[in-house]
Amino acid sequence: MGFYDRYILPPLLNKVMGAKPIEHQRRKVVPEASGTVLEIGMGAGHNLPFYDKSRVSRLIGLEPHPKMRERAAARAKEAGIGVEFTGLKAEDIDLPPASIDTVVVTYTFCTIPDVPKAMSAIARVMKPEATMLFCEHGLAPDEKTAKWQRRIEPVWKRIAGGCHLCRPVDRMLTDGGFRIERMETMYLPGTPRFAGFNSWGKAVKAA
């Protein structure tokens, strides 16, 4: 991990991920989590204030970046919620099979290097009746914006921690063996269109 990724990127991501439009999106999905919860890519812990502590019996936070885990731990203390941290990547989840009731993924799929492998790992640890709550940005539906996304993405990935702009959220989920039960979409207000097309909702493992 280079100097930029270790020391400069974490505070930048912390600020961006704490923006009001993104916070509003988090509030739409995180409170639904219940039981034993696995959050993929906890980052600096921006979801933590929105968990319903009366519904969550155990919270596991997967976050490979040590500086982000430090920020998340501080935020967990402020929120009064316990978190069991693991530094593994989404592709390498080391939890027992069928042990998770809810998976929470917000603004994370865009940075995962091997999405199919991560989807397989996530599905393995989910109980048969478990749900995935997701809120992600991705490929825009209008071609004009999508063209700009494709042009910008090579540079964007280098400065934004490997963030991809052109991943279609619905296709990632269905190709990964999930069935979308509910999904809404919109362009986030106050956000550049190339990074602002959001999809959020709930998915389950396909039969």
Residue ranges of model-derived segments:
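Core SAM-dependent methyltransferase catalytic element
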Residues: 185-207
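Conserved alpha-helix/loop element of class I SAM-dependent methyltransferases that forms part
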Residues: 16-36, 46-50
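A short SAM/SAH-binding and catalytic strip from SAM-dependent methyltransferases
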Residues: 101-115
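Class I SAM-dependent methyltransferase SAM/SAH-binding core
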Residues: 38-40, 44-92
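Short alpha-helix
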Residues: 161-177
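A short acidic, Gly/Pro-enriched loop at the edge of an enzyme's catalytic core
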Residues: 91-103
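A short glycine-rich, Lys/Arg-flanked "PGG" loop and its adjoining helix->strand segment in the class I
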Residues: 116-131
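Conserved class I S-adenosyl-L-methionine
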Residues: 133-155, 160
